[in-house]
Amino acid sequence: LHLSLRRQRQMCIRDRLEVDLIPQGTLAERCRAGGAGIPAFYTPAGYGTEISEGKEVRIYKGKPHILETALTADFSFVKAWKGDTAGNLIYKGTARNFNPLMAMAGKITVAEVEELVEAGKLDPNQIHTPGIFVQRIVQGVNYEKRIEQLTVRKKTHDVK
């Protein structure tokens, strides 16, 4: 959630939307812990900020750490570049950051893939999410490559 979006800000102000501020690394670790069955962990990230308010604090090696609980989901929806009919998934680029963690953290994971192949056709060394974590797989259609065009000034005439 990006809080600079006007609609989300208004929902927060009117108490219609609850927001938890979580450092990105902590969010990733909470998802990973949930998928691995680890109920909670300690981290120094966020100590001394509003993020740590109301959380258990312990000192490790002289440094304060706050207790963070694992995150799980009833359903996880992930998007992969390629997958096979057994649910094995390969991601491209930054999709590798959170998708594998969310696939593990969901009780039921639904994966959308750009390309679907038969089981056994993927190189096992390239698989990022094993099929054991995927319960449903669908092949998407009509993908659009969105590329932003950098504009530094208005075009006044054609350059030859």
Residues of each region from the PLM?
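ATP/nucleoside-binding phosphotransfer catalytic cores, i.e., glycine-rich phosphate-binding loops
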Residues: G83, L101-K160
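Alpha-helical scaffold segments in soluble metabolic enzymes
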Residues: Q8, R30-A33, F75, K79, ...
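Short gly/pro/ser/thr-enriched loop/turn and capping motifs at secondary-structure boundaries
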Residues: R7, T26-E29, V117-A119
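Single conserved hydrophobic/aromatic residue that forms the stacking wall/gate
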Residues: L1-I13
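Conserved catalytic block of serine-dependent lipid acyl chemistry
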Residues: L71, L89-Y91, R96, M104-K107, ...
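ATP/pyrophosphate-binding catalytic subdomain of soluble kinases
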Residues: D15-G93
